[in-house]
Amino acid sequence: MAKKATKIIEPKPIEVTLWESANKLRGAVEPSEYKHVVLSLIFLKYANDKFDERRQELIEEGKAAFLDNAVFYTAKNVFYIPETSRWSRLMQEAKQADLAFHIDAALAALELENESLRGALPSNYYASLGLDRTKLATLLDRINEVDTLTAADGDLMGRVYEYFLGKFAIAEGKGKGEFYTPKTIVRLMTELIEPYSGRIYDPCCGSGGMFVQSMKFIEAHQGNKLNISVYGQEYTNTTYKLAKMNLAIRGITCNLGAQAADTFHRDQHPDLKADFILANPPFNQKAWRGANELVDDPRWMGFPSPPTSNANYGWILN
């Protein structure tokens, strides 16, 4: 009698496993907060893994004396992780009742140590949620099992971010996923404009997907990412932070303005002469300006002022 063929069960992709683990938070926090609970922790783990990798390189290079010198990390585009932000320390604190406060402290110290992360990480966030310590510790344990540096394509964390952002957009429903534009659409837009070099601007950048895909386009065509400068602006504070984390994880230097702000009413790049404007604006915004506001704005000089009833024309002229 012939033996039955053994069924080989392929392991689930890491992003799927993480999503399933994160689902256990449902009911404990609002869906609108859910993404920030998870993505900030994934970012912290990724930053620590890169730090540990660089630390080992320094030891192998005979530079152990410089293990705590931040310059030897930032020069390689690696975030320097202060003691308070070390993942190993956080895991030791996972059984403590004030775990949420330790996570907040870790994120605050990481942002303070690294200039490029200013404004990117949540502040005093986890303690304010009142999240059950056991659920938070369980999520930490699952993320702890992930080696974020072993992806064959070298972009595991980018994949996790894209997967989660897409899932969050679906989970939050129509009108609640403005921070995410499907990457198939972004890819098509990028292929159409071919941004090999110059300044790219997205006035409503969401989570930064336009910039990420632009860099992927350059890599696919053997271009030089240093020939591209990235500028953007985002209105929603939490989405602004997502964008900064998303771009930092990819090593993309960007100027998203000093803080989240309305592009129409507080343009943070008034003198920018962009070579490419790549955007998916929130269409059909009503009452986006008052009757006497922005009437003589220089962005539509020589054209009729966009109507107050719909911002579409304003986005085109922007």
Task: Identify the meaning behind each predicted range.
Residues 1-196, 255-268:
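Non-catalytic, mostly N-terminal accessory regions of nucleic-acid modification and defense proteins
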Residues 129, 150, 204, 232-236, ...:
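Hydrophobic alpha-helical scaffolding
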Residues 5-9, 129, 148, 156-158, ...:
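A generic short-segment signal for beta-strand/edge and adjacent turn/coil regions
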Residues 21, 34, 200-202, 237, ...:
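N-terminal hydrophobic or amphipathic segments with adjacent small-residue motifs
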Residues 298-318:
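Glycine-rich S-adenosyl-L-methionine
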Residues 9, 13-20, 42, 155, ...:
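Generic recognition of stable, solvent-exposed alpha-helical segments in well-folded globular domains
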Residues 175-279, 284-294, 300:
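Conserved S-adenosyl-L-methionine
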